[in-house]
Design a protein with these regions (language model features):
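An acidic/histidine-cluster motif and surrounding catalytic segment
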Residues: 1-85, 94-167
Length: 167
């Protein structure tokens, strides 16, 4: 697996499962771009490869990780491929635990940051996506990153206030 120890990933998956609070059996599949694209198309209706997919069951579940994307991201972000795969395993475990970063108002992001620090892992998927979006927004607005973050936080707080007043 391109210099990544299966035993090391298996030990990490067991530890991440406990820390994420996932009971039952969890299987982790390390696969290639073509296979993960087929899974993504079949189960999510998206005909493109992705880095990680999670399939929860009543207890436990399955996680599929694309080794090709993991290696490319590791190169891109300057850390070992094993670290990238661990980030993906942790992300998948949190989905199996019921977290959903698309709908949970930052709960998954907070939990992932806490566990990443505890496990000494690099930036999370959520964090990288937000950093990239922030850079793109900054390029469009010309604002420095610190101002964009402050503006984003202010906008988020404004939305929360509006939601409370509607109820």
């Amino acid at each position: 697996m391109h210099g990544v120890s299966q035993q090391s990933l298996a030990r990490f998956a067991t530890r991440a499962q406990k820390l994420a609070g996932v009971s039952g059996d969890v299987a982790v599949l390390i696969t290639g771009s073509r296979e993960i694209q087929q899974l993504n198309r079949r189960f999510r209706g998206k005909n493109k490869p992705t880095d990680v997919l999670s399939f929860p069951r009543e207890e436990g579940g399955d996680i599929a990780i694309c080794a090709d994307i993991a290696h490319a991201n590791a190169d891109r972000f300057g850390h070992p491929a094993a670290s990238e795969m661990k980030v993906l395993i942790l992300h998948g475990m949190l989905h199996l635990a019921g977290y959903d970063h698309e709908t949970d108002n930052g709960r998954m992001e907070e939990k992932e940051a806490l566990l990443r620090a505890r496990l000494n892992l690099p930036a999370s998927l959520i964090q990288r996506t937000q950093n990239l979006a922030s850079k793109v927004a900054g390029a469009k607005t010309g604002l420095p990153a610190s101002h964009r973050r402050a503006k984003s936080i202010a906008a988020t707080n404004k939305k929360k206030t509006k939601k409370r007043t509607r109820a």
